[in-house]
């Protein structure tokens, strides 16, 4: 049976009763975390303190994994800084990017958590990343005794389903150019932070096709500037 792999040096937050975290770094973690979860469901300070009591900070260097395929997913978390990428590896070794996790985004492979089976996905840091994580079992126990966190879990699940449906529509109902435009609007500046091949795999196209789309966009922008100057 696969087991969870966690760094042994991690410590939980000390503000069990709602006292402020001990360091400025921890204060910023808590601030970003609170903003992220409150964007999904209204939560009081006491609710935030409850969940911070079961979380611990984790730092990942670029290229370090939060989760590898074959491991058992057992943690949930929120990205407080940096960038994560979730992807699958095909039999030929090709990577297919499923999602990006920016600051404020929830992280953890929900499907693998629910199934209890070895993970099919990898989650890797694309740049130095800091996250707050909690054991999935602890989060379930908190939801059992807290109506506020149970509602949060329900709303998060609904949000994940909506995002999944939107992603399916993009891949099945939109052409590559439209997908690229939507990606650029949703993730401004992200292209400069990750390799082009990862953006291409997220869009379901080749890196060569992505290069063509970028070139067309540059030409269109240049033509627009020319028309504006002439008007």
Q: Which residues fall in each region the model found?
A:
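Cytochrome P450 core scaffold surrounding the K-helix E-X-X-R motif
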Residues: 87-93
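Cyclic-nucleotide recognition modules
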Residues: 97-154
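Short, Lys/Arg-enriched N-terminal segment that forms or immediately precedes the first helix
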Residues: 33, 160-169
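Short phosphate-coordinating micro-motif centered on Lys-Gly-acidic
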Residues: 66-71
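Cyclic nucleotide-binding regulatory module and flanking cytosolic helices
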Residues: 2-56
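Phosphate-/nucleic-acid-contacting segments
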Residues: 174-231
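Glycine- and acidic-residue-biased ligand/ion/polar-headgroup-sensing regions
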Residues: 63, 74-87, 103-104
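Localized chelating/binding microdomains
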Residues: 39-46, 76, 130, 167-173, ...
């Amino acid at each position: 049976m696969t087991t969870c792999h966690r760094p042994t040096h991690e410590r939980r937050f000390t503000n069990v009763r709602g006292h402020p975290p001990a360091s400025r770094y921890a204060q910023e973690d808590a601030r970003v975390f609170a903003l992220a979860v409150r964007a999904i469901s209204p939560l009081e300070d006491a609710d935030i303190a409850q969940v911070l009591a079961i979380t611990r900070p984790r730092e990942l260097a670029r290229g370090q994994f939060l989760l590898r395929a074959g491991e058992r997913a057992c943690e949930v978390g929120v990205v407080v800084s940096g960038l994560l990428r979730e992807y699958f590896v095909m039999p030929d070794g090709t990577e297919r990017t499923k999602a990006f996790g920016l600051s404020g985004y929830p992280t953890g492979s929900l499907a693998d958590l629910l199934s209890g089976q070895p993970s099919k996905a990898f989650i890797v840091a694309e740049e130095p990343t800091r996250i707050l994580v909690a054991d999935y079992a602890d989060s379930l126990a908190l939801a059992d005794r807290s109506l506020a966190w149970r509602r949060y879990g329900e709303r998060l699940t609904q949000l994940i389903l909506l995002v999944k449906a939107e992603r399916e529509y993009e891949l099945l109902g939109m052409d590559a150019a439209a997908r690229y435009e939507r990606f650029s609007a949703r993730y401004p500046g992200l292209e400069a932070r990750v390799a082009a091949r990862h953006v291409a795999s997220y869009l379901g196209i080749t890196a060569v096709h992505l290069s063509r789309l970028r070139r067309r966009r540059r030409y269109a922008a240049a033509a627009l500037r020319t028309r504006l100057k002439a008007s």
